[in-house]
Swiss-Prot record:
Role summary: Involved in nonsense-mediated decay (NMD) of mRNAs containing premature stop codons. Probable component of kinase complex containing nonC and recruited to stalled ribosomes.
Protein name per its UniProtKB record: Nonsense-mediated mRNA decay factor SMG8
Top-level taxon of the source organism: Eukaryota
Chain spans, region Disordered: 634-661
Keywords, in A-Z order: Nonsense-mediated mRNA decay
Record flagged with keyword Transport: no
InterPro entries: SMG8-like
Biased composition (Low complexity): 639-661
One GO-annotated biological process of the protein: nuclear-transcribed mRNA catabolic process, nonsense-mediated decay
Alphabetized PANTHER family for the sequence: AMPLIFIED IN BREAST CANCER 2-RELATED, NONSENSE-MEDIATED MRNA DECAY FACTOR SMG8
């Protein structure tokens, strides 16, 4: 023991020189347990008792230190638990995961096992608290301990103790007694007065709070045997260390010891200091206080001397030794309870047995027992203590049920992924009303899985996207002939007279052909109109197919070639791409190759002629050249025609300087001689006058492979589509349109008020006859030609055009400029068609039927009323959408007959090289052409051969683009 007045050792070894001292106590040994919190490095909670471990001591979880002071009947057990900061720090260093909840539950379980052991082997238990107030979490710990003891420990511990030597020493309650619990607060509030009355009042106040909490949660009851622990009656069980500094600064202690050593007692003053002492206010000034002053403070000093934790503990130890330990417990009537004092050997036997059953066997994974209750204790101890886990799990279960119910109650019979995501979001919101905590993430994953399984259980929607981006609403598992999105649009037929309901198309054929064929069967006008026959694929074999990758999609092929040239590896990537996208094709079925030519820019405006006024802003460049944009020159004859057109334009330009002012706004047409070949073509025109080509096509087209998609300027002319996506029809004579009344409802239905007018277009044309012998010229001219000649060669043409837009609700309207809807009235009187003819027109424009600018209408029809004159209007529409410029795909462009009402219906859906071009959700505010536009310069004019009045001209004349 050396300079210490106590002994300390680690359980279970008892030093040989201490064992005889403990044996002398026989059956009067009181076991006092010290447990709780500490902040020092050695996890020491014995500082208030004036005890401390060896300097070489290393704290550890579950370690028990024994303290014994000779001359006392107490054996103090110091329990090192995870409530000690030093032990908790060690566990943190060993922790590998970052799950705080699991770590906290693990630390609490370890502390509960040590506290459970202390309640079974101790008579008195001192709970040490480093804070200044009571920690209410101890109430929760006591509740868990009571649950574990009543539900698990009492089921196996008494039975298993009876099988050992400790069974005869302990009662059926399997412990020495109902232990008395005391509370030691190492720190007193600094703002409280350290007087006897104030300290006692503060201790009593804390006792009342603790007692109320323990009674409220049934930790202590009137029956001592059924209580987890006991509280003394009429005795203090809360102690505040208000005077002693438990862990003083060692440096300050050394300084105080030095001052005490250097202090010397009072001596007689020297005579030379007498004069100085006379200046003192009283005798003994600047000297230590005498014994009289200390005597006056004896009462306070006596209280400080007796107010120690040792004296506080001794009062309860004496109760245990005198046999009145449980008398009057719980502040109720006196009652008898079992209480046993054992010798050190007997206690050691009980301690070993209980420690092994409650703690030791849990740490041994290989331990096997036949006791089912004990087996359940070993297996479920941690789970039974994790009430937070049960609480959070219960909340998550409630939230899960609520979320599943919300999902299933709102789910329709068949729904798609968008609806599923919305329903799942609503289910998650319903879950979050109840479910929360660390297990919420797992519960949400389970909720998503259950909802997904419910959706896939015969409720999944097909969700095949339509060409307008709407999913199919048919069941995915159930067989269905065709897709249907459930969305219905109102659309007009080819001629525009009849409107019908069209389902959302899923194929290009449904969008651009089948619907209009269906409407043509119901429209009285469509069956009567004259249609221009657009070139389509005519198979020569039964197993015809879509064109190969290289022929059908030249743009994709060119991109693949460019990538191959840059990357290493040669042609392997290109060959792989061809195998992936193309079908096998025989050598005999390959399309004929065309020589590469340079394509002209479809967006460029034609050049202006000096013979034509700038106010009309029209070009008189040779239209023959424009007819062959993107195509190779087919014959020397056509080349000569184009050349002659250019020459005539230049000759007319040189002579225009001497012309009069009346010829300033004239369009010059150079007439050519009629040849035998022209006469033959004229004979052909009698057979098919309504669909007359300008120049016969000499290029070979494929009869085994068709073009999958719309024709554009980069697609080969040897491939034709299966069906026409455009429609050009003559709906009647020009007299059916009146500029005073506009388009009537019985003729063109669905037009908005004021937007049902065509715009006038005045064109002045001067015909230039070829030089002939007068007699030959007289023979070649008919009566009508002589009549025109009689009235002069100048013609004033009145053309009416209209660019019609149609929305999905069936509303139709005309545009008077690229950015303005025709409003009628002043717009008709003021505006002409020059703004729409000479400018690019947007493919999409906001419909005025809705206030939202996102509700778009699409350019669907071009209305043309041709004049009654010996000229024909030529159509060459070019729709620029994205990187594609779509055309009619005709090798020869259509010629509109005179004095007739023609309607060109545009495609409903545009598809490029295997790429569907969907309508935009909204237009760009700064550029409404970004989503597509109809290029300017789609109209041309050609002179009609007047030798045959009952025929349309088929001779290759000089053409001029308007």
């Amino acid at each position: 023991m050396s300079y210490k007045n106590y002994y300390t050792w680690k359980y279970p070894d008892i030093p040989e020189h201490v064992a005889p001292l403990l044996l002398e106590l026989q059956n009067s040994l009181v076991i006092v347990g010290i447990i709780g919190r500490s902040k020092c490095a050695q996890a020491n909670k014995m500082s208030a008792f004036g005890m401390q471990p060896d300097k070489t001591h290393e704290p550890a979880d579950g370690q028990i230190l024994c303290y014994y002071k000779p001359g006392t009947n107490m054996l103090l057990l110091h329990f090192e638990t995870t409530h000690d900061e030093a032990v908790l720090g060690q566990q943190l260093l060993k922790q590998t995961s970052v799950d705080f909840d699991s770590f906290y539950e693990q630390m609490r379980s370890r502390f509960l096992r040590m506290l459970l052991l202390a309640l079974h082997v101790c008579h008195i238990l001192v709970y040490v608290e480093t804070a200044q107030t009571f920690d209410t979490t101890l109430v929760t710990i006591c509740q868990l301990l009571k649950y574990v003891r009543e539900k698990h420990v009492l089921d196996f511990l008494p039975q298993m103790l009876r099988e050992t030597a400790a069974g005869s020493l302990l009662s059926d309650r399997a412990r020495l007694c109902t232990p008395r619990v005391l509370f030691l607060f190492e720190n007193y509030p600094q703002d409280e007065e350290k007087s006897r009355e104030r300290i006692s009042a503060y201790e009593f106040q804390t006792e009342d709070k603790i007692y109320e909490l323990l009674r409220q949660y049934n930790i202590v009851t009137n029956n001592a045997n059924n209580s987890l622990f006991a509280l003394p009656n009429n005795k203090q069980f809360v102690f505040y260390n208000a005077h002693e500094k438990l862990r003083p600064d060692q440096l300050l202690l050394a300084i105080e010891a030095l001052n005490a050593t250097m202090y010397k007692s009072d001596s007689k003053e020297e005579e030379e200091d007498t004069e100085i002492l006379e200046l003192a206010p009283f005798e003994g000034f600047v000297k230590p206080y005498g014994a009289g002053y200390e005597a006056r403070e004896s009462d306070e000093q006596l209280y400080r001397k007796k107010h120690t934790v040792w004296h506080f503990l001794q009062r309860h130890v004496q109760d245990a030794l005198q046999g009145c330990f449980d008398e009057g417990s719980f502040k109720q009537l006196p009652q008898s309870a079992q209480f046993q004092l054992l010798g050190v050997n007997d206690w050691h036997i009980c301690m070993d047995t209980i420690h092994r059953l409650l703690i030791g066997n849990i740490q041994e994974v290989s331990y096997v027992t036949n006791n089912q209750n004990y087996k359940a204790y070993l297996r479920d101890f941690n789970e039974s203590l994790n009430y937070e886990k049960k609480f959070w799990g219960h909340l998550c279960d409630l939230g899960l049920k609520k979320g599943i119910s919300a999902y299933k109650s709102s789910a329709p019979a068949i729904y798609g992924s968008v609806t599923h995501r919305q329903l799942l979001a609503d289910a998650i919101l319903a879950f979050e009303e109840e479910g929360r905590g660390p297990y919420a993430e797992l519960a949400l994953a389970k909720l998503s899985e259950i909802c997904l399984r419910h959706w896939h259980d015969g409720r999944q929607q097909c969700e095949q996207l339509s060409l307008r981006g709407n999913p199919c609403t048919q069941p995915k598992d159930a067989p269905h002939d065709k897709h249907s999105s459930g969305i219905v649009h109102i659309s007009s037929c080819n001629c525009g007279r009849t409107q019908g309901r069209r389902e959302d198309p899923f194929t290009l054929r449904q969008a651009n052909y089948d619907y209009y064929e269906h409407m043509a069967a119901m429209c009285n006008l469509c069956v009567k109109v004259k249609k221009f026959q657009l070139p389509v694929f005519t198979p020569s074999i039964s197993d015809y197919r879509a064109a190969a990758f290289e022929a059908a999609f030249p743009l994709l092929l060119q991109a693949a070639k460019n990538r191959t040239e840059i990357a290493t590896g040669g042609d392997s990537d290109l060959e792989a791409a061809g195998e992936l996208y193309s079908q096998p094709i025989n050598a005999t079925e390959q399309a004929p190759q065309k020589p590469q030519i340079t394509l002209s820019n479809g967006c460029s405006q034609p050049a202006l002629s000096a013979t034509y006024g700038s106010d009309l802003n029209m070009s008189i460049a040779g239209f023959g050249a424009s007819l062959n944009e993107g195509e190779e020159v087919r014959s020397p004859e056509i080349s000569s025609q184009i050349a002659s057109s250019g020459l005539s334009s230049r000759s007319n330009s040189t002579s225009s300087g001497t012309s009069s002012a009346n010829t300033a706004n004239e369009l010059v047409l150079q007439l050519k001689e009629r040849t035998d070949q022209n006469a033959a073509n004229a004979a052909v025109s009698e057979i098919c006058p309504e669909a007359l080509p300008i120049v016969a096509s000499t290029e070979q087209v494929s009869t085994t492979e068709y073009l999958p998609g719309l024709v554009h300027m980069s697609s080969g002319c040897e491939l034709l589509p299966l069906f026409p996506s455009w429609s050009l029809a003559c709906v009647g004579p020009s007299s059916i349109y009146s500029h005073n009344t506009g388009l009537q409802e019985h003729f063109q239905s669905g037009f908005l008020s004021g937007a049902n007018f065509l715009l006038p277009w005045d064109v002045h044309v001067r015909l230039v006859q070829p030089h002939k012998h007068p007699q030959q010229q007289q023979q070649s001219m008919g009566k009508k030609s002589q009549r025109y000649r009689k009235h002069g060669d100048r013609l004033a043409l009145k053309i009416f055009v209209g660019f019609e837009y149609e929305c999905s609700r069936g509303h139709r309207f005309m545009m008077c400029s690229p950015d303005r809807v025709l409003r009628g009235g002043a717009d008709i009187e003021r505006d002409t068609s020059s703004k729409v003819v000479n400018n690019n027109m947007p493919l999409y424009f906001p419909c005025p039927c809705r206030a939202q600018p996102t509700y778009l209408a699409q350019l669907m029809r071009i209305h043309v009323v041709t004049p009654k004159a010996p000229v024909n209007i030529i159509l060459d529409p070019k729709m620029c959408v994205g990187k594609y410029t779509f055309t009619l795909g005709c090798p020869t462009l259509p010629r509109l007959s005179q004095s007739a009402y023609w309607i060109l219906r545009l495609p409903y859906v545009y598809q490029g090289d295997n790429v569907l071009i969907t309508p935009p959700e909204r237009l760009e505010p700064d550029d409404n052409m970004a989503s597509g536009c109809l290029l300017a310069g789609m109209f041309g004019i050609a002179e009609t051969d007047t030798n045959e009045t009952n025929q349309q001209a088929i001779t290759p004349l000089t053409f001029t683009r308007l």
